[in-house]
Design a protein with these regions (language model features):
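Active-site C-terminal subdomain of aminotransferase-like
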Residues: 188, 193-275, 289, 358-360
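Conserved N-terminal alpha-helix of the aminotransferase class I/II PLP-enzyme fold
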Residues: 33-79, 86, 100, 108
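Active-site phosphate-binding strand-loop segment of PLP-dependent enzymes
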Residues: 10, 109, 120-176
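PLP-dependent enzyme catalytic core of the Aspartate aminotransferase-like
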Residues: 2-4, 317, 326, 330-360
Length: 360
């Protein structure tokens, strides 16, 4: 069977070149005589892998030296608890709720202190991003938390909060590595890797040095950022295969794509094709305010739920899989992450037009 176009929100597509390299090295990595999945995390081969992966991430994202990088088990959801456990030093934090995951992060933080929801776009079913310059932030907040791209509702920030003396913490799971990011605007960036980086099973956190070392003594060892970051992610056995795959994807981004500036141009061109089609007809609709439309996750609906269901079924038969929208919003969602080729978007639009003509 031919490979399909996978529009899943995550786990999602990986570059075919990366998959083929992993396939070629599956049984024996280099001269190790073993697979990366088998080797000791203390071996010289894996030591080189993890160091090279971090170094490549630092180059690709231009991460300053005063930030530490860590590879964590537990995914981004575990970070929802780690953030307040490590950073909520005043007992308070500000949260901007723009979708499901930022809401879950706020609820988790409320277990450990005051999680003040200072702005929300729930009033319009999360179809926009609040004006970050008009939000009444709390000066005694330990940090401000955002989810920079909203996978379920298909929105993204066009600018981020900048409050003097209050660090910004961002969940970038569904937009990381899709475009350049000024890391210096953030105290902490974290992301699950299964959307735009690697297979499921790991999160990466980028933390500014001055935010470390303030967790209470009763914070569990493995929930303390300092535990892993001061041991270069080797306090215990790390998610070795995910780290290896992350390294391959980063090298692909750096060498084949040419970096994040080029990746952004490619992604914006793909998204434009899909949004231009949606705006040019009336059968399919996208509810998001234009300024805040996500480049990564494009949501749309047909005239009724029955047609939505029919569309997803026929799309899957045609080789376009995982287009069903999240249960919270219904409809369809095309996640067009880095690895989705432009031809996949072009062919999806052709299929959408065919479906429209047959069902309008």
């Amino acid at each position: 069977m031919a490979r399909v176009y996978n529009f899943s929100a995550g786990p999602s597509m990986l570059p075919e070149k990366v998959l083929r390299q992993a396939q070629a090295e599956l049984l024996e990595y280099g001269d190790s005589g073993q697979s990366v999945m088998e080797m000791s995390h203390r071996s010289k081969w894996f030591d080189a892998i993890i160091k090279d992966t971090e170094a490549t991430l630092r180059r690709v994202m231009n991460i300053p030296d005063n930030y530490k990088v860590g590879f964590f088990q537990g995914g981004a959801t575990q970070q929802f608890a780690m953030v307040p456990l490590n950073f909520m030093t005043t007992g308070k934090a500000d949260y901007i709720v723009t979708g499901n995951f930022s809401n879950l992060a706020a609820k988790e933080a409320a277990k450990f202190g005051e999680a003040n929801i200072v702005a929300s776009s729930k009033d319009k079913n999360f179809t926009y991003i609040p004006d970050v310059n008009a939000i009444p932030y709390n000066q005694d907040a330990s940090y401000i938390h955002i989810c920079q791209n909203n996978t379920i509702f298909g929105t993204q920030y066009v600018e981020v909060p900048q409050v003097e003396g209050v660090p910004l913490v961002a969940d970038m799971s569904s937009m990381i590595l899709s475009k350049p990011v000024d890391v210096t605007k953030y105290g902490c960036i974290y992301f699950g890797v299964q959307k735009n980086v690697a297979p499921a099973g790991m999160a990466i956190a980028i933390v500014r040095d001055d935010l470390l070392g303030h967790a209470a003594d009763n914070v569990p060892t493995m929930m303390n950022y300092t535990t892993l970051l001061n041991k270069d992610s080797m306090y215990n056995t790390p998610p070795c295969w995910c780290i290896y795959m992350t390294g391959l994807v980063l090298k692909y981004l750096e060498n084949d794509i040419g970096g994040l500036v080029n990746m952004q141009k490619i992604n914006e061109a793909k998204a434009k094709v899909l949004y231009d089609y949606l705006d040019g007809q009336e059968f399919f609709t996208n509810p998001v305010e234009h300024r805040y439309r996500s480049t990564m996750n494009v949501t749309f609906t047909s005239p009724n739920p029955d047609l939505d269901k029919k569309f997803c079924a026929e799309a899957a038969e045609a080789g376009f899989v995982n287009l069903k929208g999240h249960r919270l919003v219904g409809g369809m969602r095309a996640s067009i992450y880095n690895a989705m080729p432009a031809e996949g978007v072009d062919k999806l639009v052709d299929f959408m037009e065919k479906f429209r003509k047959e069902n309008a």
